[in-house]
Amino acid sequence: AVITGACERDLQCGKGTCCAVSLWIKSVRVCTPVGTSGEDCHPASHKIPFSGQRMHHTCPCAPNLACVQTSPKKFKCLSKS
């Protein structure tokens, strides 16, 4: 099966996306939108473009947002106010 948006690196994806691990198939990476306000994020996500292979399901937050810890194991993209 051909997976639409499959990628290896960020540079293969368009603006506002990164090449993140698929939620459904861990061996596949897909172009994924950056995190918007209130979405889950990972504090260790690399900036875009990242030259290596990402290990997380989420992309970094959008430029105007920060990845903020909201509970012991949860992080969300929230505005940098």
From Swiss-Prot:
- UniProt function note: Potent agonist for both PKR1/PROKR1 and PKR2/PROKR2. Potently contracts gastrointestinal (GI) smooth muscle.
**What organism is the protein native to?**
Dendroaspis polylepis polylepis (Black mamba)
**Alphabetical GO biological process terms:** endothelial cell proliferation
Alphabetized UniProt keyword annotations? Disulfide bond, G-protein coupled receptor impairing toxin, Secreted, Toxin
| Keyword Disulfide bond appears in the UniProt entry | yes
Q: Spell out the protein name for this chain.
A: Toxin MIT1
What is one term from the GO cellular component aspect held by the record? extracellular region
UniProt entry tagged with the keyword Cytoplasm: no
| A GO molecular function held by the record | toxin activity
